[in-house]
Curated annotation (Swiss-Prot):
Name of protein: Glutamyl aminopeptidase
Pfam families (UniProt xref): ERAP1_C (PF11838), Peptidase_M1 (PF01433), Peptidase_M1_N (PF17900)
Site, as annotated: Transition state stabilizer: Y471
Protein species of origin: Rattus norvegicus (Rat)
Chain positions recorded as Zn(2+) binding sites: H385, H389, E408
């Protein structure tokens, strides 16, 4: 699964945090302030169309539980009170038939499950949620004899339906199985999980598509099942659907039947053994394009008919990366076909359902005439990510969700290898620094982080670990591991792992064992220190080659021994270092309490570069004079260091300064050379690294103008050099969008003028904005010259365009207006899915929070509408849980109190428990940081000529 859709692309905006403006009125009335009361200026009513009433299918109402076939019960007399399913019940095969009643927004179904029992029992239980059983379940012995059912009931605390037999059910042996048959009914509305319906417009006509999304615990919402990843079984799936629709599932079609004048039945081939979360089916009226893999497998992309041309790139990149992975993993893809389908309203970024991968449109469809280079890269990356899962996740699945990283960390790592193969000039093996390694190091330096392998025991905890630690830290430590044992042995170890656990489940220790066989290195001993405890070390260098380690934390006052870790927050570190262009690796074992001395033969003025290209998941701190030398070398000849090393120096220095381990003077001195910097990686990371300072002082009328002036001067040479013509290589286009956006952010008059000029010409219909500049033009054009007429025109264009990537950019433009009345209307539009799709609600809130006029409004709106959001999305929705992180830029005691009061009022955090911890910790750190650092930072910027 690709989850990172609620965050805007790095190419779209500076990922800086913004400080909320709280005026005297807000101070006075605190949390109960209404949006219109808490605004900073009065505004006349506008003419923007008011949101229409939500359509009926957005209701979260369930079918009536008539007849009480399996009534609710609090009976806890059996093992069903446990969160985990018992080991003695093992499903073997499902026969699943679903009838899709599109116009009624519901479906009916019947599932027959073949079950093995390893011990005698009278009770069977399996998962169900928000789906009703319409007939007393039927159970048959291996002989075919029907077993009398004493009763069935739903135990909703653990989302089970329990079936109790009148007689003992003897343990099975050999191929003998019990046969459990359940008839059920479900609703197609209310959310973007389970089996749901959404709509789209084709030539002015509203059409529907119904599809599933099951990871991690939503298969139980579609049909009764044993909904745990290690309960693998085979499936025969049939769909009965209106005759004007077609059907898809994991496997190819076996046969199609016409039932009558209105209905068809599509039956699919029997599947391989797979986990419930990978089961997928869809009913659609799409068209398709196809490629064929080198091994002869059909690779098909399904899209709306009017979007067919935008699927060409996805089809091409699929073939290139698919062929690469079949070779790399030395294992042929396991199914007869691989389909992809773009869902018009889709909750996650994409989902790797075996044989039928589902996508948000922004992640599959690319129009070379209308999409930006960043959009193209996003499509390639997500396609590659989901292709990795066809091996890591589908063929071999983690045994339980505590090892989620075996799926997502691996997909996040290998996606870069796949795209690098297909698009060799994109620098993808370096871009992993920008996309994964450096961003997640900030997350993992909080006390509220969590280990890569983490205990989870509720659906909310399961969904919450689909986060940066599982994805990006997982990818980062694999990158370090591959470099240590060599790429060739790493590849061999992956092949051993896939072969040994094909169609099975595995744990982290199983992967380590496979790599040890391939490399003859102590992989488990080293890597367990990176997966079983949170955080990472800072390696301190003294005397040029003596190194010690300690846990790196942003909060300098935090107790580094907490929460307790059996490993004591020390790591076995593969220390890579370069000397005169030659690389070496020394494993620094945690048992060396006093540190180690690297075996280098340095000359008097030599420099030992520790962690070249930031290959290891740790930070490096040098002595003060070494930092001075690095700054001087950057200024005199920055090309002495690789672009990745320049990025690493800057990111480490600013993180160390934020943690009070380095003077800010040393970190800021590293930026003096930027007038000579021309490469994408360093500029992209500089913009991110300094964004914390920018956000903390954005409301400081004395200091912020000095910050703006300095960075305007630093970015001007590269901005002038690149200009506003959308030309050059893929990387050049990404660089141009980043530096021009940064120039606009820093108030550069020429850049803002160009953005406004392009925006105003677009408003008049005179000119099309270059595709790679559209986001920053929509954003800064709206910010600087946007009025109500401009805002309404932008909204109209959003509603007219069919390309999802263009819609996303226009949503950001709408969020950038300074008119707070329009922002208030925009927030209320989030309640109308006819205007703003359900998938985009949290994206829009986050976009508004990036607006200095909207950041407090977005937070206030969340508080005022929390009950509505919980009712619409459920408390276990990971995107709802994470939306509280828009408050990360807050830095006052009042704002902290408001957050604490809000969380106290709504103590049930669901999937947001960890994000709440993290945002509170961050805001407390911000408050302390300002007290400690304003003076020294002010002195540095004041001293600038």
């Amino acid at each position: 699964m690709n989850f990172a859709e609620e965050e805007p692309s790095k190419k779209y905006c500076i990922k800086g945090k913004h400080v909320a403006i709280i005026c005297a009125t807000v101070v006075a009335v605190g949390l109960i302030v209404g949006l219109s009361v808490g605004l900073t200026r009065s505004c006349e009513p506008g003419t923007t169309p008011a949101p229409s009433n939500p359509p009926p299918h957005t209701s979260t109402a369930l079918p009536p539980q008539d007849q009480n076939v399996c009534p609710d019960s609090d009976d806890e007399s059996g093992e069903w009170k446990n969160f985990r399913l018992p080991d003695f019940i093992q499903p073997v095969h499902y026969d699943l038939e679903v009838k899709v009643l599109m116009e009624e927004d519901r479906y009916t179904g019947i599932v027959s499950i073949s079950v093995n029992l390893s011990k005698d029992t009278r009770d069977l239980w399996l998962h169900i949620r928000e789906t009703r059983i319409t007939k007393l379940p039927e159970l048959r012995r291996p002989s075919g004899e029907q077993v009398p059912i004493r009763r069935c009931f739903e135990y909703k605390k653990q989302e089970y339906v329990v079936i109790q037999a009148e007689e003992d059910l003897a343990a099975t042996s050999g191929d003998s199985v019990y046969r459990l048959t359940i008839e059920f009914e479900g609703w197609l509305n209310g959310s973007l999980v389970g089996f749901y319906r959404t709509t789209y417009t084709e030539d002015g006509q509203t059409k529907s598509i119904a599809a599933t999304d099951h990871e991690p615990t939503d298969a139980r919402k579609s049909f009764p099942c044993f909904d745990e990843p290690n309960k693998k079984a085979t499936y025969n799936i049939s769909l009965i659907h209106p005759k004007e629709y077609s059907a898809l599932s994991n496997m190819p079609v076996e046969k199609k039947e016409t039932l009558d004048n209105d209905w068809k039945k599509t039956t699919f081939m029997k599947s391989v053994p797979m986990s419930t979360y990978l089961v997928c089916f869809a009913v659609h009226q799409f068209t398709s394009i196809q490629r064929t893999s080198r091994s002869g497998k059909p690779l098909t992309v399904y899209v709306q008919p009017n979007q067919k041309q935008t699927a060409e790139y996805a089809a091409n990149i699929t073939k290139a990366v698919f062929d690469f992975f079949e070779d790399y993993f030395a294992m042929e893809y396991s199914l007869p076909k691989l389909d992809k389908i773009a869902i018009p309203d889709f909750g996650t970024g994409a989902m790797e359902n075996w044989g039928l991968v589902t996508y948000r449109e922004t992640n599959l469809l690319y129009d070379p005439l209308l999409s930006a280079s960043s959009n193209q890269q996003r499509v390639a990356s997500v396609v590659a990510h989901e292709l990795v899962h066809q091996w890591f996740g589908n063929i071999v699945t983690m045994d339980w969700w505590d090892d989620l990283w075996l799926n997502e960390g691996f997909a996040s790592f290998f996606e870069f290898l796949g795209v690098n193969h297909a698009e060799a000039d994109w620098q993808m093996l370096s871009q992993v620094l920008l996309e994964d390694v450096l961003p997640v190091q900030e997350d993992d330096s909080l006390m509220s982080s969590h280990p890569v392998v983490v205990t989870v025991s509720t659906p909310a905890e399961i969904t919450s670990v689909f986060d940066g630690i599982s994805y990006s830290k997982g990818a980062s430590i694999l990158r370090m591991l591959q470099d240590w044992i060599t790429p060739e042995k790493f590849q061999k170890g992956c092949q051993i792992y896939l072969e040994n656990f094909k169609f099975k489940n595995a744990k982290t220790s199983d992967f380590w064992d496979s790599l040890e066989k391939a490399s003859n290195q102590p992989v488990k001993e080293v890597m367990d220190t990176w997966t079983s405890q949170m955080g990472y070390p800072v390696v301190t260098v003294s005397g040029k080659q003596n190194v010690t380690q300690k846990r790196f934390l942003l909060d300098y006052k935090a107790d580094p021994s907490q929460p307790p870790s059996a490993l004591g927050y020390t790591w076995n570190i593969p220390i890579k270092w370069t000397e005169n262009g030659n690389s070496n690796i020394t494993v620094y074992y945690r048992s060396n309490r006093e540190g180690i001395t690297l075996n280098a033969n340095l000359s008097g003025d030599g420099f030992l570069k520790i962690n070249p290209d930031h290959i290891g998941f740790y930070r490096v701190n040098y002595e003060a004079e070494t930092w001075d030398w690095i700054a001087e070398t950057l200024s005199s000849n920055h090309m002495n260091f690789s672009s990745a090393d320049r990025s690493s120096f800057i990111d480490d220095a600013f993180a160390l300064a934020r943690a009070q381990l380095l003077d800010y003077e040393k970190a800021l001195n590293l930026t003096r050379y930027l007038t000579s910097e021309k490469d994408f990686l360093p500029w992209e990371r500089v913009i991110s690294a300094v964004s914390y300072i920018i956000s903390m002082f954005e409301d400081d009328r004395e200091l912020y103008p000095l910050i703006e002036t300095y960075f305007r001067s630093q970015v001007k040479p590269i901005a002038d050099s690149l200009g506003w013509q959308d030309t050059g290589s893929h990387i050049t286009k990404l660089l141009r969008a980043s530096v021009l956006g940064f120039a606009c952010k820093m108030g550069a008059g020429e850049a803002l003028g160009n953005a406004s000029q392009l925006f105003e010409a677009w408003l008049k219909g005179n000119e099309s904005i270059p595709v790679n500049l559209r986001l920053l033009v929509y954003r800064y054009g709206m910010q600087n010259s946007g009025n109500e007429a401009a805002w309404n025109y932008t909204l109209e264009q959003y509603q007219k365009t069919s390309l999802a990537q263009e819609k996303e950019k226009l949503l950001y433009g709408l969020a950038s207006v300074k008119d707070v009345t329009l922002l208030a209307r925009y927030l209320e539009m989030l309640k109308d899915p006819n205007i703003i799709k359900t998938q985009d609600v949290f994206t829009v809130i986050r976009y508004i929070s990036y607006n200095s006029y909207g950041k407090s409004m977005a937070w206030n709106w969340i508080q005022l509408n929390w009950d509505y959001l919980v009712n619409r999305f459920t408390i276990n929705d990971r995107y709802l849980g994470r939306i509280v992180t828009i408050a990360e830029p807050f830095n006052t005691e009042l704002q902290l109190w408001q957050m604490q009061s809000f969380f106290a009022k709504y103590p049930n955090a669901g999937a947001g428990a960890k994000p709440r911890e993290q945002v509170l910790e961050t805001v407390k750190n911000n408050i302390e940081w300002l007290k400690l650092n304003r003076k020294s930072i002010s002195e540095w910027f004041t001293s600038m000529p």
